[in-house]
Amino acid sequence: MNDTFMKEKPVFPLILSMALPMVISMLVNSLYNIVDSFFVAQISENAMTALSLVYPIQNFANAIAIGFGIGISAQIAICLGAGNKETASKAATHGLALSALHGVLLTIGCILVMPGFLVLFTSDADVIDLGIRYSTIVFLFATINTTNLSYEKIFQGVGKMKVTMIGLMVGCVSNIILDPLLIFGIGPFPAMGIEGAAIATGLGQVFNLVFYLIVYKIQPLQVRLSRKYLHPDKALIARLYSVGIPGALNLALPSVLVSALNGLLAAYSQSYVVILGIYYKLQTFLYLPASGIVQGMRPVIGYNYGAGEHKRVKKIYYVTLCMSGVIMLVGTIICLTVPGQLMGMFTTNPETIAAGKMALRIICAGFLVSSVSVTACGALEGLGRGTASLVVSLCRYLIIILPAAFILSSVLGAVGVWHAFWIAEALTAGVAFFISQKVIGV
């Protein structure tokens, strides 16, 4: 990444070139999650249940690692934009060291917490045993994972999006290959069942990290990791956490929302819980291109902000907003025209499909306007304004949608929950625009 490339290349092709690798990476990761679940489901239903119960804690650990990584990436991009390579290198070194420490703490904490956590959700001794066996191995690799994600965000911070794309693909593809070999004992490998799935996940992370280490050694970067930068810089650490903590909470909030809405919908019918689950599976793919664009925008907007290119910062924001808006408009059209086919991909129950069609058509009314809050969150994180980004996410996932869902469901029944989605998106867009205007001056 050089000054000419980041400061002078036309904004649209620049963001597109940064975003496309991210979109591909996220698609590969989504495919991996589906394939991994498929292989575990072949072991037994209890194994799949155990995997599902462990997932929230895995998601929590990943949220911490990725959220802090966003803070690393933001500081690197801003410092490089300001021409301060020394501070950028110090941010990368501090971030990597702290990420490794987070991994050690997560290993200890998650392994200790898991038995008690599983007991909260099931009394089946076999499921608990499978969950403990799987999670213990997975969390032994936590330091590898946090270090891995730290390198990923360092590469993103300097604009090496293709490197992170290839790295993620190396990890995911190796995991997909190893899953059947280690789970079922193909060839020279012993059959290890659910432990095999956990080892495959860990080895995928190892291969990913090895790839990043090789690239770091052979490819010159504008930041260097060095022991001389390890002396604690309290102000820099505070800046890393000022984005990292809100970033982690932003990633964890959707899980909190789903849990709350599941409890609300279960009072009406279990089929509504199924519909919500299907919607979030679909949402992953519908929002994926927009999320990739926002990820690609983060280092670009941070770099230009650090360089004092304020007019270009505004242009980057608006181009990203328009790109996200077009994608969400396409998603809206798809949900309005073929909702039955979308629901039919995940269930064959006619009643669930009929109710799901209505749900999709109501929820998608908020897709287009949601591009405002999605873009604002990414821009604010890229500018190092983590707290402002968290305020937008809190409005979107808790403060507005939950009261709206409770009030509307008491009047309209379960359908009221679906209306709460677009209402929350519309009101949050107003909050996001107001905050963006104050911070960015859009």
Language-model segment annotations:
Residues G69, V138-Q156, T164-C172, A197-Y212, ...:
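Short runs within selected transmembrane alpha-helices of multi-pass transporters and secretion channels
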Residues E8, F12-L31, V35, I57-I64, ...:
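Residue-level signal for short hydrophobic patches within transmembrane helices
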Residues S17-D36, I137, G171, G204-N208, ...:
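Transmembrane helical elements of multi-pass membrane transporters/channels
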Residues M1-A19, I76-T143, F189-I245, I301-G366, ...:
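Short alpha-helical transmembrane segments in multi-pass integral membrane proteins
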Residues M48-I108, N145-G159, V163-T164, N262, ...:
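Small-residue-rich hydrophobic transmembrane alpha-helices
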